[in-house]
Amino acid sequence: EQETENVGEDFILQEIIHNQFANKEYEATEQALRDFLSINHSKDAIDRGTFYLGETLLYQGKYQQALSCFLQVQDRFPDLTTRWIQVALDGYQLPTSSY
């Protein structure tokens, strides 16, 4: 039963990535991934969904939210997240105050 559940999770994630993310429909991808992550899934599926959400947020310029996603899965995907964390940090700038 666990294996069947994992196959279903994999299928849903791949559908989101191939049908929306690949077509640069980032707002739709973000919503689909947030919906996916709101349901109880395996740790592996949650980690992958969180990573994909980070990428989606990054492409929308939501650097702080993207950074948060990448930091959540940094231990799981160290090689992949290192680059994306740096990109998010480069894009994210603290607001400057003028005195």
Q: What are these model-predicted stretches?
A:
Residues 55-68, 88-99:
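Alpha-helical linker/edge segments of TPR/alpha-solenoid repeat scaffolds
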Residues 1-5:
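Long, contiguous interaction/recruitment modules in multidomain scaffold/adaptor proteins
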Residues 6, 39-45, 71-84:
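Short solvent-exposed coil/turn linkers within tandem alpha-helical repeat scaffolds
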Residues 8-35, 39:
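Alpha-helical segment of the N-proximal tetratricopeptide repeat
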Residues 27, 31, 44, 63-68, ...:
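Surface-exposed, polar/charged faces of alpha-helical domains
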Residues 47-51, 79-98:
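TPR/TPR-like alpha-solenoid helical repeat scaffolds
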